[in-house]
Curated annotation (Swiss-Prot):
Family from the record: Belongs to the SpoVG family.
Protein source organism: Fusobacterium nucleatum subsp. nucleatum (strain ATCC 25586 / DSM 15643 / BCRC 10681 / CIP 101130 / JCM 8532 / KCTC 2640 / LMG 13131 / VPI 4355)
Protein name in the entry: Putative septation protein SpoVG
Function field: Could be involved in septation.
Matching PANTHER family: SEPTATION PROTEIN SPOVG-RELATED (PTHR38429:SF1)
Domain of life of the native organism: Bacteria
């Protein structure tokens, strides 16, 4: 599967500690996954899959890639798009 479209909604860094953006990803122009999050971790940015809080207060992914290659592709494309938005905004200012 290939990432064919990415939509990013940046969030205010002052209001959210680690959250950088909400993300929607389209795969093969056939499947859209809403509710991904671009997070800042101790070892860099990563994409958190959509999740639901369970009764025991634990979070479970609603959807997630089974193969690491797809997860890496999603992360790479999302980060590239996020940083491209940063550069576009800096050019406008």
């Amino acid at each position: 599967m290939k990432v064919t479209n990415v939509k990013i909604k940046k969030v205010d860094g002052d209001k959210f500690d680690r959250l950088r953006a909400y993300v929607d990803v389209t795969l093969d122009d056939c499947l859209v996954i809403h509710g991904l999050k671009l997070m800042q971790g101790e070892q860099g940015m990563f994409v958190a899959m959509p999740s639901r809080k369970m009764r025991n207060e634990e979070f479970k992914d609603i959807v997630h890639p089974i193969c690491p290659e797809l997860r890496n592709d999603i992360t790479k494309v999302v980060q590239e798009k996020y940083f491209a938005l940063d550069q576009e905004q800096e050019a406008v200012i």
